[in-house]
């Protein structure tokens, strides 16, 4: 015998949300939500109700073109039907699982990623986000080399957690520079060259000379990792000159340093190849 009352669900269990205006949503948001990287007394967020493709729609029915793909992560556009369907199917099967267990979906995702990775990549370490990925990459580099220092660039962004924010190369790291062992260098930027370069080739050569000088100055046997965005994103889409990333790879190999390519913004097809360092 089945108790129909015990299993019955009704539409009244989750009543539909009332129609809201931009002004109402903004008021509630500002009152209750802490916005990162923002002066809380000066918040003026744009309320967004839904989106499709590259179009955002607010609560008053106005449409906007999403030129930044949010934080450069909506590669396939908003509300792509195949993505939504895949999320629904996985939610019906299993919502979450501890990392100690095996899971077919996660294993298949890792297999697909590795099928597009260059030779030498054997496993995928899944994390919750970019800062988390960089934190773990730094820890792995230090464990692998037995060294401490991490060299990263000015005009960079690597996340807002302990070591990631200190590796970040803009002023926002300064109130919280508690992680140790971080050194910054200038990267190539032909538009406002720090090396008085007159050509892309010269900019590349001098930026690599500068990086090697810092490695030598800090002591090669103290440097665990070079952490770079393949294409700096938050500081401006600064595409490196031809040969720069290859030169960094050669310096890392020369001194036994781990090269960490932060591609949270630049990877997975955004630069024309699966990984930006291949472009």
Regions found by a protein language model. Name each.
Residues 2-279:
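Conserved N-terminal phosphate-binding loop of PLP-dependent enzymes in the Aspartate aminotransferase
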């Amino acid at each position: 015998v089945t108790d129909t009352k015990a299993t019955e669900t009704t539409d009244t269990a989750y009543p539909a949300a009332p129609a809201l205006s931009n002004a109402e949503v903004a008021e509630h948001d500002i009152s209750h939500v802490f916005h990162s990287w923002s002066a809380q007394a000066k918040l003026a967020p744009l309320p967004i109700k839904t989106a499709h493709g590259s179009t955002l729609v607010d609560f008053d029915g106005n449409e906007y073109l999403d030129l930044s793909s949010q934080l450069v992560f909506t590669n396939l556009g908003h509300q792509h039907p195949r993505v939504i369907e895949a999320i629904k199917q996985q939610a019906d099967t299993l919502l979450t699982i501890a990392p100690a267990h095996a899971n077919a979906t996660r294993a298949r995702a890792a297999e697909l990623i590795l099928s597009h990775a260059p030779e030498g990549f054997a496993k995928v370490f899944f994390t919750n986000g970019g800062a988390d990925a960089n934190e773990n990459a730094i820890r792995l580099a230090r464990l692998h080399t037995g060294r401490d220092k991490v060299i990263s660039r000015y005009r960079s962004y690597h996340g807002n957690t302990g070591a990631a924010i200190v590796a970040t190369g803009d002023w926002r790291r300064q109130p919280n520079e508690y992680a140790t062992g971080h050194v910054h260098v200038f990267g190539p930027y032909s538009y406002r060259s720090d090396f008085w370069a007159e050509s892309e080739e010269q900019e590349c050569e001098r930026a690599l000379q500068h990086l090697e000088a810092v490695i030598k100055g800090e002591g090669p046997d103290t440097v665990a990792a070079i952490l770079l965005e393949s294409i700096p994103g938050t500081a401006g889409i600064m595409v490196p000159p031809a040969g720069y990333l290859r030169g960094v790879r050669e310096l890392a190999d020369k001194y036994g340093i781990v090269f960490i390519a932060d591609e949270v913004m630049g990877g997975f097809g955004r630069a024309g190849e699966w990984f930006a360092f291949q472009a």
